[in-house]
């Protein structure tokens, strides 16, 4: 994300995307874990240090001396500006950036979103890991496509209804308790609200272009109000309070479903989700593999940490000819001394059992 175009911009975009996969991991998205690869784990590690939630930091950090923007030299012709971890305390002096398209201000000491009205060419704004309590003063940025205000102190989703070109919105690890004020964001393709205090899926009926929805690590008790999201391909609901798989009948394009760390007892409600390639139901209370024989495109099936006892249940997966990875560890059937051999015999296409690759 250097001030120059070309290779610098490409590297910038790759770094920010990988960072966001780390964010997705925080919301319980195993896809983020698979692809994140730890490339930039150190960037988010500062926020996760000792498991301290934002808003309860060391008081001394609150009084860290901010840098005066006058001491920072800005390239007036830059299209990509990266001021990551500069100890900036106030957004000011950026009006000279007439050509800027991507502005990264992550890991600073910013408390208020302000003085950005002149940056009307801005497409991407990254405010990850600051001290922002309110989304405000963004109305002029009507061309914005990517907005990241993760790891801040937000309590409400507000002040973004004019950002109608927004395609990706990241509000991970805040204190948000309700999904609201996003009905005008009809171009949105990715919505990441993991690690908040949300109790219900609501107010997303107009987001018909949404492809990825991440709501892991919240307090949601029911899968509902998803009918309009027929273009959804990824749904992450890990670490919530779900007890039943339901409300997915219209998600006919769903390819990845993450439901681990809930209170689900029965595999059901997936009759119309024939395109699933990834199903994660680990760490629930499920005793039986059932109702998924029609999921013939499955490539990964994660059901570790459940109550599975019967080997015959694996027959339910035999139609998935492309199945390569299964996680079944910490189920009662793993106690069988022939555990790995029996999995291999039942599912000959599998190349990875739990964390270990199959040897031939």
UniProtKB/Swiss-Prot annotation:
Ranges of residues in domain LRRCT: 331-360
Compartment list: Nucleus
Keywords: Acetylation, Leucine-rich repeat, Nucleus, Phosphoprotein, Repeat
Example GO biological process: chromosome segregation
Modification sites for N-acetylalanine: 2
Superkingdom to which the source organism belongs: Eukaryota
Keyword Nucleus: yes
Residue positions, PTM Phosphoserine: 12, 24, 27, 44, 47, 322
Tagged with keyword Acetylation: yes
Any one GO CC term of the record: chromosome
UniProt LRR repeat ranges: 77-98, 99-120, 121-142, 143-164, 165-186, 187-208, 209-230, 231-252, 253-274, 275-296, 297-318
Ranges of compositional bias, category Basic and acidic residues: 17-34
GO molecular function: protein phosphatase regulator activity
Annotated spans, Disordered: 1-63
Pfam families the UniProt entry points to: LRR_4 (PF12799), LRR_9 (PF14580)
Similarity-based family: Belongs to the SDS22 family.
Functional note: Regulatory subunit of protein phosphatase 1.
Self-association and partners: Interacts with PPP1CA, PPP1CB and PPP1CC/PPP1G.
Designated name of the protein: Protein phosphatase 1 regulatory subunit 7
Native source species: Rattus norvegicus (Rat)
Gene name, Swiss-Prot/TrEMBL: Ppp1r7
């Amino acid at each position: 994300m250097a001030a120059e175009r070309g290779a610098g911009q490409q590297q910038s975009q790759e770094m920010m995307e990988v960072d966001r996969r780390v964010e997705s991991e925080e919301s319980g998205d195993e896809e983020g874990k698979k692809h994140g690869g730890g490339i930039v784990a150190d960037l988010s590690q500062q926020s996760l240090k000792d498991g301290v939630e934002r808003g309860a930091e060391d008081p001394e950090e609150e009084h860290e001396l901010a840098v005066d923007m006058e001491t920072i030299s800005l390239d007036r012709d830059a299209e990509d500006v990266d001021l990551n971890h500069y100890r900036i305390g106030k957004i000011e002096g950026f009006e000279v950036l007439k050509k800027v398209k991507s502005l990264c201000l992550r890991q600073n000491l910013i408390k208020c979103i302000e003085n950005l009205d002149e940056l009307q060419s801005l497409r991407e704004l990254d405010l990850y890991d600051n001290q922002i309590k309110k989304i405000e003063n963004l109305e002029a940025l009507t061309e914005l496509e990517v907005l990241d205000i993760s790891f801040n102190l937000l309590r409400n989703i507000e002040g973004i209804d004019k950002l109608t070109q927004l395609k990706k919105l990241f509000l991970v690890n805040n204190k948000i308790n309700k999904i609201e004020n996003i009905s005008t964001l009809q171009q949105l393709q990715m919505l990441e609200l993991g690690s908040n205090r949300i109790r219900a899926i609501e107010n997303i009926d107009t987001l018909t272009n949404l492809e990825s929805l991440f709501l892991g690590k919240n307090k949601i008790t029911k899968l509902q109000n998803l009918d309009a999201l027929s273009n959804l391909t990824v749904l992450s609901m890990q670490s919530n309070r779900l007890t039943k798989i339901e409300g997915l009948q219209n998600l006919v394009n769903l390819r990845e479903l993450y439901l681990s760390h809930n209170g689900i007892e029965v595999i059901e409600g997936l009759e119309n989700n024939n395109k699933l390639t990834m199903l994660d139901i680990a760490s629930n209370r499920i005793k039986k593999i059932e109702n998924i024989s029609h999921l013939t495109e499955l490539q990964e099936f994660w059901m570790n940490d459940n109550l599975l006892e019967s080997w015959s249940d694996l027959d339910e997966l035999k139609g998935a000819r492309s199945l390569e990875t299964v996680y079944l560890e910490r189920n009662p059937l793993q106690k069988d001394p022939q555990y790995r051999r029996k999995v291999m015999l039942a599912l000959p296409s599998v190349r990875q059992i739990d964390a270990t690759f199959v040897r031939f």
